[in-house]
Regions:
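Alpha4 helix (beta4-alpha4-beta5 surface) of REC/receiver domains from two-component response regulators
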Residues: 76, 97-126, 130
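Receiver (REC) domain active-site loop signature in two-component systems and cognate sites
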Residues: 69
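Short amphipathic alpha-helix used as the core "switch/output" element in two-component signaling
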Residues: 53, 75-86
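Non-catalytic signal-transmission and effector/linker regions of two-component phosphorelay proteins
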Residues: 1-15, 122-168
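Active-site beta3 strand of CheY-like receiver
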Residues: 58-64
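Acidic catalytic/metal-coordinating carboxylates
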Residues: 47-50, 72-76
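Conserved acidic segment of CheY-like receiver
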Residues: 12-25, 29-33
Length: 168
């Protein structure tokens, strides 16, 4: 047996679904996310309805949703996705990160509403990193020691001026 192979540790690659009607933004987010070898975009959608269909088919760990999309907005898509993927961590990454949007997102399964403005990409990467770290801990722990697989709740995320926590 190859010693290098025997000591190799399986690393779970975080599967991320990205839904935004702006193709240039999707391309930028994809490039930034895939710089991390632990993460990969498993699918992209330009509208909410396609996001729901892809989530059902691809079973992502993280779903990034824009608020304003054709056919179905991000909050409506999150309600549907959460009904069949309760363990997926969902984030609303939007230019509309207002208190009104946070109120609409309440109870949808969305863990955070992040603004695209300012350091939006850094906040998004921080969210994914936190989910990735917690997911990796669940996959690498012995079966009796694995952490809960609940979705992120509002107490899991720090809130800043451009990161609004939501309550369930």
């Amino acid at each position: 047996m190859d010693v290098a192979r025997a000591t190799e540790v399986h690393v779970h690659r975080m599967r991320i679904l990205l839904a935004d009607d702006n193709a240039a933004l999707r391309q930028t987010v994809r490039q930034i996310i895939e710089e991390n070898p632990r993460w990969r975009i498993c699918g992209e959608a330009a509208d909410g309805r396609t996001a729901v269909e892809l989530a059902r088919r691809l079973n992502p760990d993280v779903v990034i949703l824009d608020y304003k999309m054709p056919l179905m907005n991000g909050v409506e898509a999150a309600h549907l996705i959460g009904s069949f993927l309760p363990r997926a961590s969902m984030v609303l990454f939007t230019g509309e990160a207002t208190k009104a949007v946070v109120e609409q997102a309440r109870g949808s399964g969305i863990a955070a509403v992040l603004s695209k403005a300012g350091n939006g990409y850094l906040r998004l990467l921080s969210f994914i990193d936190r989910v990735s770290t917690e997911t990796q801990g669940r996959h690498s722990a012995p079966p009796g020691k694995r952490k809960s697989t609940k979705r992120h709740g509002p107490s899991d995320l720090g809130a800043g001026p451009r990161c609004l926590r939501i309550s369930r």
